[in-house]
């Protein structure tokens, strides 16, 4: 369908770089790709009671990362809401952890909340609920997806979360954990089921594992 995709504007509301012991709280943003991102050399950050809605951009790679821990450590995002994003609660490449996303809610979601890119470690998703056409929670072998991501992360924990698709895979020499999760029940619409199947098949094909999606 049609949507607003102009990109001639700022895309990140708050970017924390080389910052320690800081917080962002009680903020609502509209039309930004990203509400808050943390980068390397960033520690002890809290983002809480945040809202990120109606981003204006193309719905494609590199866009719509609502809450993005991209290299930070000891970062906590809690009680955050988003709509119409792709990766709501997401890690960047080789993010060391520990980090956590707690009590988050996303709707009209177009991609996964996950360790993204490659080999991040040590993150908790606790009571994260996602709804939408391609909403999912994943810690997977992303194979040749993107720029050749491969294994996205290790020592990830998904605790009491819900999404139309939840896919947690075990990387070599490490573990990922899925505890108390609900799939499909949170959003059992035809659109969500179709998106879940498409996402699942993409991961299975690129990681070359023998798994089949059961409707």
Regions found by a protein language model. Name each.
Residues 20-31, 42-57, 71-87, 95-110, ...:
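Right-handed parallel beta-helix
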Residues 1-10, 51-66, 133-145:
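Acidic/polar low-complexity surface segments
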């Amino acid at each position: 369908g049609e949507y607003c995709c102009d990109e001639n504007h700022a895309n990140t509301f708050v970017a924390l770089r080389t910052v320690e012991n800081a917080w962002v709280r009680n903020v609502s943003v509209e039309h930004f790709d990203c509400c808050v991102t943390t980068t390397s050399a960033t520690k002890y950050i809290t983002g809480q009671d945040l809202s990120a809605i109606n981003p204006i951009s193309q719905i494609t790679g590199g866009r719509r990362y609502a809450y993005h821990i991209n290299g930070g450590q000891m970062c906590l995002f809690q009680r955050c809401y988003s709509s119409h994003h792709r990766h709501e609660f997401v890690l960047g490449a080789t993010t060391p952890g520990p980090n956590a996303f707690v009590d988050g809610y996303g709707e009209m979601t177009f991609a996964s909340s996950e360790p993204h890119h490659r080999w991040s470690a040590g993150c908790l998703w606790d009571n994260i609920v996602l709804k939408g056409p391609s909403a999912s929670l994943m810690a997977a072998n992303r194979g040749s997806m993107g720029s050749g991501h491969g294994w996205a992360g290790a020592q990830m924990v998904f605790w009491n979360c819900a999404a139309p698709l939840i896919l947690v895979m075990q990387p070599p020499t490490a573990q990922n954990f899925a505890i108390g999760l609900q799939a499909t029940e949170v959003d059992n619409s035809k659109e969500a089921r179709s998106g879940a199947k498409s996402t699942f098949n993409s991961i299975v094909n690129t990681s070359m594992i023998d798994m089949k999606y059961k409707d």
